[in-house]
Every structure is written in C-alpha cells, then in structure tokens.
C-alpha cells in the first residue's frame, strides 16, 4: 500500500507570477482549470481505481481498514483533491465544479506551495469567487468583503498580494454571498466558501500568481 502511494500523480500548478495583462491572466487561469479537469483528472482517477483495488484485496480486519475500504469505494468514481489517506472526511470533487480563489500573502503562498497544500497548520480556509483578474475592484473593497465574510481572521492588504486557484471540495461550505462595489459604483455579487479547520493535508492547487 505504501509503495502504491509513491506513484500518486501530482498536478503541477500553473505559475502566473508575475501577473500579465488582465485578459491574459483570465485566459491562463481558465486554461489551467481546463487542463486539470479534462486531462489530469483522468490520470488521477485511474490511479485512484488501482489504489482502491489494492485496498479491497487486503484481508486485515480492523476499524481503520473498514474506513479505508469505505474511502476506496468512494475513490473508484470520485476525484479526490489529495492522495488517498486515512481520513474520515476526504476532500472530494463536487457534483458540479466550483472554481474558487484563495487570497494570501507572498510568504504564505510560498509556504502552501512548498507543502503542496492550501493551509498552514490547522486553520480554516476562506475562498471566494472573486477573480484575481478583476481590475475594477479596489483593494480596500476586497478587504472589506473578506473581513465581513469571515471576521474570525482579519485580513490586511498584504494578505491580498497573491492568489491560488483551486476547485472547492465537498468540505467547502457556502458561507455567504455579498455585494461588492466596483470602481464604477456598480454592485456585483460575490460568494464566499469556508473549509473548516482540519488536519493539514495535501491539496491540488490549479494555478497561482500575484494580484
């Protein structure tokens, strides 16, 4: 089982640093999402099926093995955004893809990329549908809606320097939908999702860059 895990395919996130023109950034992000869902996901699902077959062949009788076999049954048909591991609540793909963005400081982005994760330690993760290529939103407005959506952790300007793009898993729950006011005075809806604090685990990042 351990040797199988060594061959788990990892997606190489698209590096969009430094950010180019907004229209180019938009196209690059959409292309990265398409590559993940249309190319990489097939390779990943094939791996998960092979891993599941290995688990089903194990004869060990224990609660731990029961949980692993339940996970294996899920992963035969459902994309998981982290390698197969002993968890009762895996980060599975939703029935309908939800593309979201997590804003963070340069230092934090570097750390999560090194750890191939989306968290630093055990912390909640706030994600939003606000795209990083939107040039009509002021930094202060971005700060306002982020802090209103999740007041448990106050964000500062440096926390908006960078972004990572991901598919939200089934563990991301809808938090709120707020209105942001753009530079032209028009109100636009933006949605926030939160993934509650959990043990740190790997998670596939689709793209990353500066804002």
Curated annotation (Swiss-Prot):
Pfam families: RolB_RolC. The keyword Iron does not apply. It catalyses: O-phospho-L-tyrosyl-[protein] + H2O = L-tyrosyl-[protein] + phosphate. It comes from the Eukaryota. The keyword Glycoprotein does not apply. Keywords: Hydrolase, Protein phosphatase. InterPro entries: Glycosidase. It is an enzyme of class 3 (hydrolase). Belongs to the rolB/rolC family. This is Protein-tyrosine phosphatase rolB. It comes from Nicotiana glauca. The gene is ROLB.
């Amino acid at each position: 089982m351990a040797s199988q895990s060594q061959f788990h395919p990892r997606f190489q996130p698209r590096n969009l640093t430094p950010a180019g023109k907004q229209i180019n950034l938009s196209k690059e992000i959409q292309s990265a999402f398409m590559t993940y869902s249309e190319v990489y996901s097939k390779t990943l699902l094939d791996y998960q099926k092979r891993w599941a077959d290995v688990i089903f062949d194990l004869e060990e009788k224990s609660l731990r093995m029961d949980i692993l076999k339940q996970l294996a049954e899920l992963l035969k048909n459902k994309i998981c955004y982290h390698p197969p591991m002993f968890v009762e609540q895996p980060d599975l793909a939703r029935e309908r893809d939800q593309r979201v963005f997590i804003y963070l400081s340069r230092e934090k982005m570097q750390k999560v990329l090194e750890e191939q994760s989306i968290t630093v330690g055990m912390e909640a993760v706030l994600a939003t549908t606000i795209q990083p290529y939107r040039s009509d939103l002021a930094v202060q407005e971005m700060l306002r809606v982020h802090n209103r959506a999740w007041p448990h952790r106050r964000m500062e300007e440096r926390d908006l320097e960078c972004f990572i793009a991901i598919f939200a898993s089934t563990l991301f729950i809808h938090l709120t939908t707020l209105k942001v006011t753009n530079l032209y005075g028009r109100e636009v809806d933006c949605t926030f999702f939160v993934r509650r604090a959990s043990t740190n685990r790997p998670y596939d990042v689709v793209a990353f860059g500066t804002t």
